């Protein structure tokens, strides 16, 4: 089967990009590719043949129909207007045509200098490409909307960050790379007609059912807000901290995008800060819902030329509704509740307070809870708490709540184990794979990718364990 590409972005939004070619790396070589995703997309296996060099995965060749561009956008970073940003090291190679007219962006990260590189070198490093590949695939298999990773190319090109590292490229796929920052760019340039063109493009290609509806813009923004709310709810329930929620890192389609200083909670700490550059804690774990709302308000400002204020405010309310509704539903599932009862929030908050006091592992606590039997006061979870009396008191109330529903243990446990993962991408697991890869050993990278494809399967190895001492509180920065 021949891959087909189109260039809708390039053809329809000429003010939003610069056309240019990738700059290949020295001695580039393919070290990993996503075999399952490649099969789903009918990508010929021959394209991954190492004897052909890095090929399209390293920017050495293009596939027929590809028309590479670097996109321009702006944004607020850490709450401050940063002005023009853009693809400083990434290039949109093309949009693969899929069934029923949908498309998939092929975006090559680390592809070299662009007009938007500012003071950067246009490169990505092996460390960051491995982290993004692992994180995006982990999120996908957790059922959370995200970009995807298709391939990683390593090289001998030296790249200077805090220390000297080596350059790499990541092929990232997404239904769209349209960001809040695209709209901000033209709004602050006082070009509202181009802001509207972006909205028209989004509606035409991602929400075509609204194209001929008079209130299409208001409906579209409501859906953007709702998708954002559901996304943030998913992050909070799985213990994911993005780390750098700038407006240019926010997807119009409600995808998790731009994995940098992210982290999954180890110990339950609602104030967890994954990014060591975030000195004020703006992007701490428990502040993510408020930051997402703030970012939506910045996007709403750009839409004021063609959406009424009341409609924008209704959409922002929709964000809150979607966030709270989805979060509540997901947390009830994590607790094994099939109905909503008035004291559920209090019971959950009591558990969170107990976990915070004890430093309980977020993922392991909920996974162990999913093995609870209604009639048994014993639980392996009890042994993880120091204050056994406090746990026993909470656990008695929890089992009493379970007994209010006519659901047998087997069915409830099955539901809980579908939403409470045994494995998440802890920073120490990613670092172990990176350390080995930087020494030329890719086995752990491949092994970890396989493990992350089955996050809801119980394991008795260290992929499902708490981090070792060296792996606790690993510092992660925006440097990539």
Swiss-Prot record:
Ligand binding (ATP): 86, 88-89, 109, 121-122, 172, 179, 258
Residue numbers annotated as active site: 248
Catalytic reaction(s) noted: L-seryl-[protein] + ATP = 3-O-(5'-adenylyl)-L-seryl-[protein] + diphosphate; L-threonyl-[protein] + ATP = 3-O-(5'-adenylyl)-L-threonyl-[protein] + diphosphate; L-tyrosyl-[protein] + ATP = O-(5'-adenylyl)-L-tyrosyl-[protein] + diphosphate; L-histidyl-[protein] + UTP = N(tele)-(5'-uridylyl)-L-histidyl-[protein] + diphosphate
Entry keyword annotation includes Signal: no
InterPro entries associated with the record: adnlytase_SelO (IPR054838), SelO (IPR003846)
Disulfide bonds: none
Coiled coil: none
Keywords: ATP-binding, Magnesium, Manganese, Metal-binding, Nucleotide-binding, Nucleotidyltransferase, Transferase
EC number: 2.7.7.-, 2.7.7.108
Enzyme class label: transferase
Name of this protein: Protein nucleotidyltransferase YdiU
Record organism: Salmonella enteritidis PT4 (strain P125109)
